[in-house]
Amino acid sequence: SERYWLDRPSGLPGNSAVPLVSVDGAMNHAFDGAMKPTEALMKSHYIHQAIASFGEVVARSRLMRLAPGAQVAEHVDFNYHWVSRVRIHIPIITNPQVNFYCGDESVHMAQGESWLFDSWRRHRVVNASDSARTHLVIDLAGSSRFWRIVRKADSLDNIVILPNDHSQPRVKTEQFPVAPVMAPGEMLAIVEQVLEDCESNPDNDSEMMLRYRHLLLDLVHDWREVWGLYGFNDGAFDRYRHILDRTARQLAPQPRVLVTASNNVGI
């Protein structure tokens, strides 16, 4: 039903989506909260079956529609949601004039195929046709079984999931997508990854690079100190917020004072 289709949060013209797995199973695009199947998914047995066939714990998942002649502008997915999750695209309605661009590669995702891509690379989508394109889009982190399949994908036979009205699919959904406070080890890993990416860009100023390295590692060290004393206790949140605010005040005002080498994102 058309009543399930929502405009995308980005406000891009011609982009709409039906939430299938969402926070509390409601009609939203949120990330932070227990994920549940929506009414739309419960009424779509075959789609329910397709998502369940992966056997994975899934995060936010949607039907995503791109109107005739519309496009998704080039961008990078750098929300915290994407630190540990990837996106699966399964084209439901498409045609050869719909193309996906990721980095320096382009591909037409054919109907019924299953595609996985690196959303940290710059990517965009163009629907140059006169008909709408609809994909089933599933976000997940993936178990070791899932990643073994990904590693062997080029040598595996295709698996066809046919509609089965007698099946009782169960979609496992994330219940704890975000910790109340980021663990210091996770923060350090993210900081080191960003710093390494920026240090790989020869155009970045070396003095500014050193300044940001010290600033961000100071953030991690002080975060770890508060974590060791208070953990998740309610009284700790003001202390964590103080560290974040202090760090933010020391950032340079320019939005691109440092730029990543991998995808040209400004820090």
Which residues fall in each region the model found?
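Conserved short histidine dyad/triad with adjacent acidic residue
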Residues: L63-H81
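Extracellular structured ligand-interaction cores
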Residues: V58-S61, R85-H89, Q97, R122, ...
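A short beta-strand-loop-beta hairpin characteristic of the jelly-roll/cupin
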Residues: P91-Q111
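Charged, amphipathic alpha-helical linkers/stalks
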Residues: V137-N204
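Charged, low-complexity interaction regions
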Residues: V181, E199-M208, E225-D234
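Short beta-strand His + acidic residue motifs that chelate non-heme Fe in jelly-roll/DSBH
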Residues: A73-H75, V98-F100, F117-D118, R122-S129
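Non-heme Fe(II)/2-oxoglutarate
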Residues: S1-S53, V160-H166, R213-I267
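A short hydrophobic beta-strand segment most commonly corresponding to one strand
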Residues: V86-P91, L116, D130-R148
